[in-house]
Curated annotation (Swiss-Prot):
UniProt protein name: Large ribosomal subunit protein bL12
Keyword flag Methyltransferase: no
Signal peptide: none
Organismal lineage: Bacteria, Bacillati, Mycoplasmatota, Mycoplasmoidales, Metamycoplasmataceae
Native source organism of the sequence: Mycoplasmopsis pulmonis (strain UAB CTIP) (Mycoplasma pulmonis)
Keyword Lipid biosynthesis: no
Amino acid sequence: MAKLTKETFIASLKEMNIQEVMELVQAMKDEFGIDPSAVAVAAGPAAEVSEEKTSFNVILKSDGGAKIAVIKAIKEALGLSIMDAKKMVESTPVAIKENLKADEAEELRKSIAASGAEVVVE
């Protein structure tokens, strides 16, 4: 008997209908003693690809019409000069502070948003 190549097997499989494929699978289970539930258990749960975000950026989207109050809030929160805070507010959207922990980012967002600014944490 000639050796069956992978390509020949796949080509033959493509020509089969669903019933024939199911019969082939059952025959393989019987011949090789494969238990499908054992294969699923051996594979285990799929590894989670998503990582939990640990670094956050606080972004000033707009001054919300309260430019002076927002400038003061940024000056106090970041320890900037009044001119640096003004430049930051005038160049929205701008990252106020980057690479913060979640609680620090939320605290900063709340303190600046209290002045009327539109601030988001990303």
